């Protein structure tokens, strides 16, 4: 993941105090260093500033951000967090339209697609993303978020000024913007948490761009456009057609997400979701003469204290080992002690900027910090139960 941040105002001229506002942009990406750490950059114009903290995945050498391109004397700039999986479909169309690609990064594809197709181009993207584009010709700043909200994007808008960031903590680097909670904030944390009401940023006057939406900020103010929405329709396919369709989508999804300029691994719990992802990823790696790295996690002494329940009748380990025998991956078993878990609790809250699922967040943060030493990209079975409406196995 990367971290993005920035601000925009058509009433203020940021370059009148250039060093001051450049320092603000630097402070914003420094707050997001845990989201990247490979590189950082800023971009400042009279009416907009962009800041980026990079985790390099695609075109490690030439994909630096903010990325700026020029047309008819105007700047077009982007800061982007995410992955686009259909660049192979977009590049030929853009190339034939006369766009000259200087990198192999998906960042450049997004920026050129905006310049060519306009603001609604986002409906053409297949991927997970949050990004901001400054259109120097139209004097407009756009904020985009992917269809299901995989990548976060928070913002504050007041008195003709917009501030945005991947995490709330970076917003509070902006002058006169400080964290405060309200009665509604407490309702969110105590009644809804660890989830949130869609669009709610918990802190006072902080909001989150809705999944499947994009915002446009200009002289007319802030507008919100829905480019995609989940529809509830009767399922009319036969059982056989459903199996074939889901199989195609899973294979296509994993294949597209294996494309990276850095090693890709999977998390393997032995459950249905992670096992399917791992099996498909391992097959892809074998086709390319490589072995997939996999990781599983457990708590120290869980073999002694584990108690069966209806949600988890057995430990993960036997199922993990079964999948390892089937997939022939290069596997690493990771453990977390109770002491380490306790030490990570505050770090987990700081990473989310608010209370979450305590031991779940803390252990995941710890395990991910270990995995990152070997792999920057991992595929997991997260959220499959949400898409299929239940965490329990079904026929």
Per-region residue spans from a language model:
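Conserved adenylation A10 loop of the ANL superfamily
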Residues: 270-274, 381, 389
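Long, Lys/Arg- and hydrophobic-enriched amphipathic alpha-helices
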Residues: 352-360
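Conserved small/polar residues in nucleotide/adenosyl-binding loops
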Residues: 388-395
């Amino acid at each position: 993941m990367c971290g993005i941040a920035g601000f925009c105002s058509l009433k203020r001229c940021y370059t009148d105090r250039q060093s001051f506002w450049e320092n603000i942009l630097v402070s914003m990406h420094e707050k997001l260093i845990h989201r990247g750490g490979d590189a950082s950059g800023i971009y400042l114009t009279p009416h907009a500033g962009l800041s980026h903290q990079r985790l390099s995945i695609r075109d490690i050498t030439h994909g630096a951000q903010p990325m700026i391109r020029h047309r008819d004397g105007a700047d077009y700039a982007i800061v982007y967090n995410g992955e686009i999986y259909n660049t192979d479909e977009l590049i030929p169309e853009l190339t034939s339209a006369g766009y000259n690609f200087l990198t192999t990064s998906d960042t450049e594809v997004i920026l050129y697609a905006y310049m060519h197709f306009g603001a609604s181009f986002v409906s053409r993207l297949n991927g997970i993303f949050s990004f901001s584009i400054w259109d120097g010709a139209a004097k407009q700043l756009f904020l985009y978020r992917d269809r299901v909200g995989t990548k976060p994007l928070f913002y504050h808008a007041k008195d003709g000024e917009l501030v945005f960031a991947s995490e709330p903590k970076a917003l509070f680097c902006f002058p006169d913007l400080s964290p405060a909670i309200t009665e509604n904030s407490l309702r969110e944390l105590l009644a809804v948490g660890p989830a949130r009401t869609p669009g709610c940023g918990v802190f006072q006057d902080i909001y989150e761009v809705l999944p499947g939406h994009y915002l446009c900020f200009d002289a007319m103010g802030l507008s919100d456009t829905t480019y995609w929405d989940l529809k509830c329709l009767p399922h009319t396919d036969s059982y056989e057609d459903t199996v074939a369709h889901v199989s195609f989508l899973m294979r296509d999804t994993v294949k597209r997400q294996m494309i990276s300029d850095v090693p890709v691994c999977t998390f393997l719990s032995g459950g249905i979701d992670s096992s399917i992802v791992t099996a498909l990823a391992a097959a892809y790696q074998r086709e390319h003469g490589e072995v997939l790295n996999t990781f599983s996690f457990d708590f120290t002494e869980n073999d002694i204290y584990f108690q069966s329940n209806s949600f988890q009748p057995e430990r993960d380990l036997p199922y993990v080992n079964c999948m390892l025998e089937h997939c022939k991956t290069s596997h690493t078993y990771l453990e977390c002690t109770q002491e380490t878990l306790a030490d990570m609790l505050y770090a987990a809250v700081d990473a989310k900027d608010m209370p979450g699922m305590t031991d779940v967040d803390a252990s995941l943060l710890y395990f991910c910090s270990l995995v990152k030493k070997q792999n920057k990209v991992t595929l997991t079975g997260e959220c499959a139960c949400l898409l299929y409406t239940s965490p329990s196995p079904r026929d």
